[in-house]
Amino acid sequence: MAAACRSEAGLLPSLLCRRPAGAQLLRVALCLLCWVPAAVDAVPELGLWTRTVNDKSGPLVFRKTMFNSTEIKFSVKSFSCSGPVKFTIEWHLKYHTCHNDYPDLEEELSQRHELHADPDVCAYFKNIDCWTTKSENLDCSSDSQAFPSLNNKELTGIRNISSQEGSTDVVARTQKDGFHIFIVSIKTEKTDAVWDLNVSLSMVGPHGYISASDWPLMIFYMVMCIVYILYGVLWLLWSACYWKDILRIQFWIAAVIFLGMLEKAVFYSEYQNINSTGLSTQGLLIFAELISAVKRTLARLLVIIVSLGYGIVKPRLGTVMHRVIGLGLLYLIFAAIEGVMRVIGGSKHLAVVLTDIVLAVIDSIFVWFIFISLAQTMKTLRLRKNTVKFSLYRHFTNTLIFAVLASIVFMVWTTKTFRIAKCQSDWMELWVDDAFWSFLFSVILIVIMFLWRPSANNQRYAFMPLIDDSDDEVEEFMVTSENLTEGIKLRASKTVSNGTAKPTSDNFDEDLKWVEENIPSSFTDVALPVLVDSDEEIMTRSEIAEKMFSSEKIM
């Protein structure tokens, strides 16, 4: 959730409240912001695979974005052969420029295998950037203790290969940075032979098992983890220095910082684990997604309660807080489902697509809530002429506007580069699609931290009942006026036959006596002291009243 940006400091708040067209445009921009990925787009690419292959299996296909000079190792860990069998194992390494090339390669190769056709893989790729090697006459029988080693003889003479551990299993080496497809085809002389192989494939680059597209993302998570640690230390120092003046909103900020630090640490540990072992720990990934869902939910709630003026304009949110928490719980549930299903079933799973739609709708509600609340809060502060708090929210609004504009520009760029491009070749920039949103929120968070930081002037931003309740003065005055008139009796008037009202007494002294007996002294002396007139005003009013009574007598 969540978004923010800078503009003209003095003009923006007035534009938000005075220009409906501009407000509608901002609302549309905020709604567009919701249709963006909320977390890591997919599971990191593996670097180590184990497969079971038998006489009925088709070619094995592996895809990965690799650095130049990445070593591909292939070995048979265990085997089972019904009789003497001679194997021919071919491997094909294909470099391709576009990430979206050959989406149906696995299905086509399986169909050719079922038709017992001998597929020429490099011919399928038109022999462009495709390298083929093979090992022939590999004997396997029930008496064999070990499967013959596999290696590419063309690579054994290269410097430093013989000194590396497991170099005898190196069957291919990449020559470029980019997208690669590695295909393993296992054949036997006897088509009716029964056999079973348990094979292992690893791809080790200059930095480890991690792919070329995930390497920058791992560094990014490490840097962001350090950034959040610095955020936490800075916030802790601020809070320790001014712990007596801590506001309630500042506890929310501390919770978001802690969850952000935990989220980045868990994701970094998962990427580091893949880089070290080549395998992904599904439980760790699920835990990371759940932490990410909690953090994103709390981050959205933080922006909402800041926009509502919690602790700044209002001492409590009342029933509005129930709606905010309910919306947050709804988002948390669907965000957790989306993250777990993406780890288990992949980003194209039906449940992931449906939850993405629901999350987009909930995010739209969040954005609408934030926009309406922020506009109302700034309007209230402007009416109260509270320049200190108004300046605070003006800077916060400018930050949100900046983030909205930055998000729109980024979405246009990613759509053009990764979504609708015929050739998705910018693999070096894939990590930006995931990292941008985390970086953008960290910018919003540091702005919120700076604006709402603990300081000696904390109480200038805190809710002050004697000052901030001015918008309720009219209502309170009406209630007080009703209570003050409870002890006042209405003076009855007599009417004559023609319906004309007649004074109850012709004597002005009797009228004054009636006032003294029926109007409580507390009303004039205590409740409304400002209504007590001076002696001169009383004499003037008495003369006017006498003239009115005299004119009525004459009539």
Curated annotation (Swiss-Prot):
The modification Phosphoserine is found at S470, S497, S534. Its main location: Golgi. It is found in: Golgi apparatus membrane. Glycans are attached at N68, N160, N198, N275. One of its GO terms (biological process) is retrograde transport, endosome to Golgi. It is a multi-pass membrane protein. The chain crosses the membrane at residues 217-237, 249-269, 301-321, 324-344, 352-372, 395-415, 430-450. May be involved in retrograde transport from endosomes to the trans-Golgi network (TGN). This is Transmembrane protein 87B. It comes from Mus musculus.
